[in-house]
Amino acid sequence: MKRCVIVGAGELKASSIPVEKEDFVIAADGGYAYCKRLGIVPDLILGDFDSVKEEDAEQIAQISRICPDSVVILPAEKDDTDMLAAIRMGLSEGCRDFRIYAAQGGRLEHTIANLQCLIYLKECGAAGCLVDETSTVFIIRDETVWFREDAAGYLSLFSMGEKAEGVTIRNMKYELDGAEVTNSYPIGISNEFIGKRASVTVKKGTLAAILSHKD
């Protein structure tokens, strides 16, 4: 499955991002500065560049002159966020597995919008996650997700609609059996792995899953 790595303009403290030669790498707006700092050469630079420093803007303009197909300049006023536009480009390149970095922190509304982008990926038959130094965020929708026996940390589940039905959690500290998880009661917060092959099943609905790493 072809993978897309997107670097956004949120917070990024990591000293490296795992990128394979076959990955399609997109720098979304201010994510270009992170790519430059980490020595990553993106296949595509995309955005309205409202969060880009002048020095980086000049470099992007120079790249655009040399290789026009590697830079997409978006209008400042548009329906799609820069991140959603980057995801659409990744999908058009045939990618179905997305790793999205620097998509959290900063302005809260952008973090929430990026979470919604994960739902969009599910609707397109793809999968993705938001990754930072402390957590990985992904979507569970009408499916069962399995975790390895050596999984560690905390797993929190939140309904992304009015309710998620038939939620079953197995082999974790707190289990559920065919429960209804609503968006007004945080029953899925801070579950823990116990050294067994755990699973989460959602019969109908969408859950946001946050896997938080232990210190």
Where are these regions (language model features)?
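Short phosphate-binding loop-to-helix
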Residues: Q62, D69-S92
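Anionic-ligand-binding alpha/beta catalytic cores of soluble enzymes and soluble regulatory domains
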Residues: D97-W146
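Non-catalytic positions within long, well-ordered alpha-helices that form the structural scaffold/packing
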Residues: K36, L91-G94
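General beta-strand structural signal in soluble alpha/beta enzymes
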Residues: V7, I26-A28, G47, V72-I73, ...
